[in-house]
Each structure stands twice: as structure tokens, then as C-alpha cells.
Amino acid sequence: MGGLSIWHWLIVLLIVALVFGTKKLRNIGNDLGSAVKGFKDGMKEGETPADAQQLPRTGTVDVNAKETTRSDSNKA
């Protein structure tokens, strides 16, 4: 008595089919399926390889560069 048997689920399914109709249930199933497919496609678009996410560094770095302050720029 703790859980529902297969017969309980079949009766519930039959009542739901009678209340909503099979056409309405089929439309709901199609909508749900397309929503899940769209979600999966969106998740695949979000995934990119780690190498593609990093931008290539082609610039040079001036090791001897000195930081200019606001007072240094006013002197010029």
C-alpha cells in the first residue's frame, strides 16, 4: 500500500486522456519535445573548446615601460 502499482498509473493515465483528449496531449508532448531539443541545442552552442576561448596574444610587451602619473603628464 506504500506505493502506486502499475494499475493505479494506468487508471490515472486513462482519466487524464479522457479529460484532456488525446489530441491535446499529443500537442503538449510535441511542444515539450521541441522545448527540450531547443534547450539541448542551446547548451551545445554554449560549449566551445578551451583553445577557442582564449584569444591569441600577438602584442609585444615593453619590459622597461614606466608608469606615468597624472603629475608627470601635467609637466609636459
Curated annotation (Swiss-Prot):
InterPro entries: TatA/B/E, TatA/E. The chain crosses the membrane at residues 1-21. It is found in: Cell inner membrane. Residues 64-76 have a biased composition (Basic and acidic residues). Residues 40-76 are annotated as: Disordered. It is a single-pass membrane protein. Keywords: Cell inner membrane, Cell membrane, Membrane, Protein transport, Translocation, Transmembrane, Transmembrane helix, Transport. Part of the twin-arginine translocation (Tat) system that transports large folded proteins containing a characteristic twin-arginine motif in their signal peptide across membranes. TatA could form the protein-conducting channel of the Tat system. This is Sec-independent protein translocase protein TatA. It comes from Burkholderia vietnamiensis (strain G4 / LMG 22486).
